[in-house]
Swiss-Prot record:
Pfam annotation, one family: AtDEF-like
GO cellular component: extracellular region
Top-rank taxon, per record: Eukaryota
Keywords: Antimicrobial, Disulfide bond, Fungicide, Plant defense, Secreted, Signal
Location in or out of the cell: Secreted
Cysteine pairs bridged by disulfides in the record: C32-C72, C38-C59, C48-C71
UniProt name for this protein: Putative defensin-like protein 88
InterPro entries: DEFL
UniProt entry tagged with the keyword Ion transport: no
Species of the source: Arabidopsis thaliana
Length: 94
């Protein structure tokens, strides 16, 4: 009887772990520049492009804060934003 209760507990524990594990693995790390302070996105957009981040950077601010820190968009994972062209002279044919 004790082994059946233990097996049931172990099964539930394994299922919870299996549900949590993928979210832990898939966390996208956003590199931020240590000690940086910013007030707008334009300041660090060019700096991140210069450092090799093709999508540029942004100013990460927290609630009720006027000064944030500079973070760069990671380039390793492609998203839907990567399909948007910066070229304004794109011809779309039907």
């Amino acid at each position: 009887m004790a082994t059946q209760k233990f097996s049931y507990f172990l099964l539930v524990l394994l299922m919870v772990f299996a549900l949590i594990l993928p979210s832990i693995i898939s966390v996208e790390v956003i590199p931020c520049i240590a000690g940086s302070k910013c007030t707008n996105d334009m300041t660090y957009n060019e700096l991140c492009r210069f450092k090799g981040f093709s999508k540029g950077g942004f100013c990460q601010k927290y609630v009720h804060q006027t000064i944030g820190r500079c973070c760069c968009h990671p380039t390793g994972l492609e998203s839907q934003e990567s399909s948007i062209s910066g070229d304004t002279n794109v011809v779309i044919t039907n």
